[in-house]
Structures are given as C-alpha cells and as structure tokens.
Amino acid sequence: MIALFRRSCGVLRSLSHFDWRSQHTKTALQREPGSGFSFEFTEQQKEFQATARKFAREEIIPLAAEYDKTGEYPVPLIKRAWELGLMNTHIPESCGGLGLGTFDSCLISEELAYGCTGVQTAIEANSLGQMPVIIAGNDQQQKKYLGRMTEEPLMCAYCVTEPVAGSDVAGIKTKAEKKGDEYIINGQKMWITNGGKANWYFLLARSDPDPKAPASKAFTGFIVEADTPGVQIGRKELNMGQRCSDTRGIVFEDVRVPKENVLIGEGAGFKIAMGAFDKTRPPVAAAAVGLAQRALDEATKYALERKTFGKLLIEHQGISFLLAEMAMKVELARLSYQRAAWEVDSGRRNTYYASIAKAYAGDIANQLASDAVQIFGGNGFNTEYPVEKLMRDAKIYQIYEGTAQIQRLIIAREHIGRYKK
C-alpha cells in the first residue's frame, strides 16, 4: 500500500513537479468572503489544471471515440486519473485524501470533460456518491469508506433515483424497516451511474411507513456495500451519449444493513441527499463547460480549414458571428460555475448559484454542440468527425443531478425569497 502511494505521488510529480498530498493547503477554504476579488488562480490550482489538461488531451481524447463505440468502461483511464490525483479530490485529509475545495475540483472536471464527458462522468460520479459521507458521515464511516478509496481506485455510487421517482425524490418507494440492530431494505433504483462498478452505495430509503410523513423526516441515508446479499445489479444501459460510463438499475431484496451504516440518524436522509448537490452541481456545470469549450474549439478549427464559395468558413460573417456567440456563452457559463464553487468554499449557502450554474451550463453545452454540428455541415452528422458525439453527450447535462426545469424551480424559489427579504 505504501509503495503504491509513493509510486502514485512520483507519477504526479513527474508530470507537474508538484506533490499534492504533502504540499496541499486549503486555499479556497481559508479565503475570507469579501477579502478581495481576483480572477488569478493559485499556483496549486494552475498545476492541477495543467495536469488534468495534459491527461485529457494526451490520453483521453485519443481513446474517446473507441470507448464511445464499444461502451466499454474506461478502467485504464480511471486508474490513471487515480494515480495522478485527479479522482476523489473531495476526500478529507483525515482520511488520506487531498481535501480540495469545490473550486479546485471544478477546474479538474472542466479539463477532463473536454477530453470525454463519458470518462469524466465515471470519475465525477464518485464525488456524488462520496459527498453524503463527507458532509454527514462520522469519523468511523469516513475512514472506512472514504479511506479505502485513497488506497486503491475504487468506485462508489449515489443510489437515489427510482423507475417512478426521478425529479420527485420525495416519491421514492424503496423501504427500510428496522429490525433489531439492522435495517431490512427492499426496493428498486434506476439510472445509477457506476452502479455496476461501485464498491459501495449511498442509498436513500423511506424509513417512516407513514405516507403523510414530511420528506424531511421520512427518509434515511445508508451506506450499503455492493456485495451485500440481496443486492441485484441490472444490465448496463445503452444510452444516447456518455456511453462508456456505467449506468444500471439495482434491486435491493431483503438487504440487511447494520445500524452503524446510517448517516447521522433515522430521518436525516433527505436533507443529506439534497445537501450534497450544493457541492456537486458546480463540478457538473464545469464539465458541461468543458464540453462546450471543446465544441467551440472544434468548430473554430474547422472554420479555419474548410473553404466554401471560394473562401474560408471563418471569413463568412454568419459563421464568425456564430462563433462569437458561442465564445460569449462559454465564458459566461464558466464564470457561473466559478461563482457557485467560490460561494460554497467560502462557507456560504450556494444553492441559488449552484442551480444557476447547472442550468445555464447544461443549456449552453447543448446549444454549442448543436452549433458545432451546424458549422461542420454534413460532416458534423457523421461519426468520422468529433462533434456528433459532443451533441449526444451534451443532452444528459439537462437531465442528471437535477433537470433544467427543476433548476429553474429552485432558482425561482431562491430569487423570490431573496426579493422578499
């Protein structure tokens, strides 16, 4: 284990000449709100960004099309990301992790998504699965389930969505019945990213049998090990985009979970599940920006090479204006996720900004992918060119971790509350 740890650090230093695990300081967490405004990254942030960019462009991009075609889970790339310190960045230092802030994680997410959002989603899904344990787990739970992920490249999953309960989280039917020192869990989950690869799950289940019980008291959050008897993992789903990520349904049949695996206590699950999103939505928005930036870059490169009507595409005002609009949207979306990340790292409630970032970045990722296909013309509709994959990959950003419509409900609620104050 120690040898592996040292070898991982050596690989990272060889790329960026920086030892994350020994020299990390919580810059974002130490910054006082209002202490000064700056767009300058710290040297550490620049190093993380450079490492992620190098990995994405030299190792992910050359393999992305093949993984998209086969749907194979990108195990070698995930192991490599883990070796480079680009996975599990939220894990606290007390558990052997880097303890990075959300802003730092966003910088990494954007760069990885530029290479392939399928690969990036497989990596980032770990953060979503870990976050309930990070924000609500006790020391024993954190060291047991987060600590092991710093020792080897293990995966976990956020197990909440059900076949008839997506956006309506309060409508989930999976039940947890307490019997002695255990809970017996029965139910079905759906669209679980990393579902077939996870070592353990964060599971949300109804523990109060009263159907009228409020969501804030009716649900409990559990840590469930994937090899527990009664856990039945479904087939890998064939999705429109992000095909190399692992998405499955999971059935829980008389699954026994010890009370020690309850997060905080009975009835606290809904708040934990929702609270995780304030920290995970900014990196999802950042990933959408990474895809949008890739679409802009591919379209710009093509417009500088392709000739029509006797001149380059870029020399046609209609194309140049379209590229200008695309560039504007990328920059605005990037600022939105950075604001959301800065807010939560500064200790502020960032629900409003996180939803704005998630909604806007998801929308512009779809718009820019479509615009890139349009600039490529017929070539853009063909798998020999990269932009058709971007268009397929982009759609999920308007769906997972809260749909575009749910984000607007949250934004409206938060906005009205602010106005009334």
UniProtKB/Swiss-Prot annotation:
Compartment(s): Mitochondrion matrix
Post-translational changes noted in the entry: Acetylated. Could occur at proximity of the cofactor-binding sites and reduce the catalytic activity. Could be deacetylated by SIRT3.
Entry EC no(s): 1.3.8.7
Top-level taxon of origin: Eukaryota
Sites of N6-succinyllysine modification: K69, K179, K212, K217, K259, K271
SUPFAM superfamilies tied to this protein: Acyl-CoA dehydrogenase C-terminal domain-like, Acyl-CoA dehydrogenase NM domain-like
Transit peptide: 1-25
Catalytic activity: a medium-chain 2,3-saturated fatty acyl-CoA + oxidized [electron-transfer flavoprotein] + H(+) = a medium-chain (2E)-enoyl-CoA + reduced [electron-transfer flavoprotein]; pentanoyl-CoA + oxidized [electron-transfer flavoprotein] + H(+) = (2E)-pentenoyl-CoA + reduced [electron-transfer flavoprotein]; hexanoyl-CoA + oxidized [electron-transfer flavoprotein] + H(+) = (2E)-hexenoyl-CoA + reduced [electron-transfer flavoprotein]; octanoyl-CoA + oxidized [electron-transfer flavoprotein] + H(+) = (2E)-octenoyl-CoA + reduced [electron-transfer flavoprotein]
Matches recorded under Pfam families: Acyl-CoA_dh_1, Acyl-CoA_dh_M, Acyl-CoA_dh_N
Top enzyme category: oxidoreductase
Pathway in which this enzyme or protein is active: Lipid metabolism; mitochondrial fatty acid beta-oxidation
Positions of FAD binding: 158-167, 191-193, 306-308, 316-317, 374-378, 402-405
Modification type N6-acetyllysine: residues: K69, K79, K212, K217, K259, K271, K279, K301
Keywords: Acetylation, FAD, Fatty acid metabolism, Flavoprotein, Lipid metabolism, Mitochondrion, Oxidoreductase, Phosphoprotein, Transit peptide
Modified residues (Phosphothreonine): T351
Cofactor or coenzyme needed: FAD
Residues bound to octanoyl-CoA: S167, S216, D278, R281, R349, T351, E401
Active site annotation, chain numbering: E401
Subunit organization: Homotetramer. Interacts with the heterodimeric electron transfer flavoprotein ETF.
Family as reported in the entry's similarity comment: Belongs to the acyl-CoA dehydrogenase family.
Protein name, per record: Medium-chain specific acyl-CoA dehydrogenase, mitochondrial
Source taxonomy: Eukaryota, Metazoa, Chordata, Craniata, Vertebrata
